[in-house]
Amino acid sequence: MAGVLAPEDVDAFLAAANRENLEATVVAEVTAEPRLRMTWKGVTIVDLSREFLNSNGAEKHTTASVPDDDVKPYEFAGDTVTEKLADMLGNLNICSKQGLSERFDSTIGAATVLMPFGGKYQLTPNQTMVAKLPVLHGTTDTVSGMAYGMHPEILSQSPYEGSYLAVIESVTKLVCAGFDYKQAYLTFQEYFERMGTDPTRWGKPFAALLGALDAQLDLNIAAIGGKDSMSGTFEKMDVPPTLCSFAIAPGKASEVISPEFKEAGHSIRLVSCDPHDTAALTANYDAVLSAIRAGKVVSAWALGLGGVAEGLFKMGIGNQIGTRIDDDYDGNLFAQQIGAMLLECTEDIDLGVKVGDTVPEWVLEYEGERIDLTAMQEIYEGKLDKVFSYRGHTGETTEKFSYSAETYPVPAVKTVKPLAFIPVFPGTNCEYDTARAVERAGGAAEILVINNLTPEAITQSIAEASRMIARSQMIVLPGGFSGGDEPDGSAKFITAFFRNPAMKDAVHDLLQRRDGLMLGICNGFQALIKLGLVPYGEIIDTSDQCPTLTFNEIGRHQSMLVRTRIASNKSPWLSRCKVDDIHTVAISHGEGRFVGPEALIRQLAANGQIATQYVDADGQATMDIQYNPNGSAWAIEGITSPDGRVIGKMGHTERVGKGLYRNVPGETDMKMFESAVRYLQNQ
């Protein structure tokens, strides 16, 4: 990042950067003389006039040729609906990308309103990214929605038509999520082959931009930013003409809907028109939005390459709800209809045409044929599984542990407003979410950015951290990827920091003399277990006989919501929970697989130190990767110290809030922070 500062602000800026553990250097000065000069080792290597820079160089001209084009509809192979459905679901532009998506943290910031995949089974792909605006204090219902549109098979035939429809598709997806298209703006990502001097090559971006411009004028929506590249050529290979439209709009979390079917017995309707008939299209947008706001439409899907058939399958897969198509529906199930919307309605409203009804079985019933969609799901999920795997162990249950506490320890000193110390190491990214969770529970939070730019800075950070722990009642190690999880594993810098004698003494004083609490989430849990604070309650030299957290069994990062069961409420952190309570919790980690000797695990279970376990939809502890994302032994998600005051867990319990994760069912708030605050208040 580069910044231009007034001379009197430079020292303050450098000091602020240092407090955030950032390197900042003065690299240039603005002068009155209108020339750009650069020197290297005392030698001037650049000396250009401002007037020359403002000219942008010499004028250039080229010729663009746009041939007549004719877009042919995409045809899926097969003579029967079953054959076409199988071909469609195996198409690279339609098949599941879940294994790719789960490599990216989708819940950071505790503001995600719609998860990338929704429904009970988290399998319906969400078409619109929706998140609350970030606020450090308080709550908000204000969200932003973002959706994209792009079809390379159309762009390759007609850059103009492909770009026009990209805009239409991106806006239609916003409407299907409950956003008003009249408040939307656009941004474009463009990528074309190297132009050279060929007029037909220049004609492709020319036609694409005309198509996008016409769509903007028709919808009265402006593009306010974008990025382009014309370097998509390698030797004799060229990228297809590419213009991806992103539509963005503000809205309210309470008015957002998600695309997964909600219940059997609802009617399914199709609203469509010629996408170039702007009056009809915008009338459809207004009518659908009105029905969504009235609660008559509970899920909606913007049709794409796979048409109605793709929409029915993807809307149904999240909750395994099938479709019975009406006998009198005569539409083409596989026709691409950009701008069309498939609606799940709670009542038979006068909007578009009726396609059919939702049914409780995971099937598609059409013209007397009953298609088992489980086999189709295998095609859909399996296409890219060898490239972006997200499937592993299935169906294996494991032992459930249970330990119910009847009484809880009392802190040595009652505190009216308990203070949590939250250290931020290089790579930590959850400190704001964690501090907000503490404050929402009635406590106070104090954040310290650990500075490791110099040896002296590390010494100062240790001294300051020790002082802050001395006045705190809790230590919370937030999640992230400290040190980039290098070298060869997570939390090494955190553990080295806490093994410093001053830090070790401060932690032991908090836990052993003042009866304080300590929590480690994700990266923080990794630090706690490598320090020995869990399961032993103190910082020790660990050995290969100690439990640890290692790389996920699937061999990559996992991000999703999981179900965890309270196995023991012995910890003050879990005093407001009951054994067998189940919560839906966000996870995001690459090293979360708990392993340890069986004898030790049995000992921990007997002492009530196994706090939480991953469970399936039936509440059974499981090794199934759909529910146990890292392959943890005995499905263990969290453990505690012997007295329960220290707890470590992989799930991001701090990532909760009103209106979040609306497309995945389940109770998300474990009230861990409320439990800790009440314990320290002796309530």
Which stretches of residues belong to each language-model region?
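Cysteine-nucleophile active-site neighborhood
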Residues: 478, 482-570
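Amide-donor transfer/coupling interface in amidating biosynthetic enzymes
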Residues: 460, 465-467, 506-509, 541-683
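Short glycine-/acidic-enriched loop or helix-start segments at secondary-structure transitions
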Residues: 13, 432, 486-488, 528-531, ...
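Active-site glycine-centered loops adjacent to acidic/histidine catalytic or metal-binding residues
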Residues: 302, 522, 652
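Short, well-ordered, mixed-charge alpha-helical segments that flank or form enzyme active sites
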Residues: 34-35, 231-233, 254, 526-530, ...
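Short, basic, glycine/proline-bearing loop/turn elements
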Residues: 197, 487-495, 612-613, 619-624
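Glycine/proline-enriched, intrinsically flexible loops and inter-domain linkers
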Residues: 1-484, 497-508, 639-640, 668, ...
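Catalytic metal-binding/acid-base residues of hydrolase active sites
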Residues: 229, 482, 524-526, 591, ...
